[in-house]
Design a protein with these regions (language model features):
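Nucleotide/phosphate-binding catalytic cleft detector across ATP-hydrolyzing
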Residues: 1-10, 16-123, 134-142
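Active-site-adjacent helix-turn-beta-strand microarchitecture at beta-sheet edges
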Residues: 129, 133
Length: 142
């Protein structure tokens, strides 16, 4: 059984499909600059909202065609900082697309998970609207 993860970021909305052993099967990236609206105006324009909805509906169609039963839509900084993200989420819910906006701390925790087995190392995630840094020093995550 395959699983799909959709990353709704500040500069692009991308998906990755993994097989049951979490090997990457497919990757797709569509540049859609949510951060352009959010970081300059504080909210998403109507046209941008419509683009997001259309794109996520097309992703959902792909997942159904590929018989992917488990998929997750995750949003980060742009929707976290957006004054009208609730409007977008409500419009998506009507279409059975449930988006989870994760906190910066959650992003950092995910990095920590990636980095936990590599002592004396650092992982840096430079996104369009935030930066998360995870340091593993003497097997302690910071």
């Amino acid at each position: 059984m395959n699983i799909a993860i959709v990353d709704i970021g500040s500069n692009a909305i991308k998906y990755k499909i993994f097989d049951s052993k979490f090997n990457l099967v497919e990757y797709y990236r569509h540049p859609l600059r949510l951060g352009r609206d959010v970081f300059s105006q504080g909210y998403l324009n109507k046209n941008t909202i419509e683009e997001v909805i259309a794109l996520l509906e097309s992703y959902l169609k792909v997942f159904k065609e590929k018989e992917i039963a488990e998929y997750y839509f995750i949003a980060t900084s742009a929707l976290r900082d957006c004054k009208n993200s609730g409007e977008l989420l409500s419009l998506l819910e009507v279409k059975n697309i449930n988006v989870q906006i994760i906190s910066g701390d959650t992003e950092a925790s995910l990095l920590a998970e990636l980095n936990k087995d590599i002592n004396n190392s650092a992982v840096i995630d430079i996104g369009g609207g935030s930066v998360e840094i995870c340091i593993n020093s003497d097997n302690k995550i910071h």
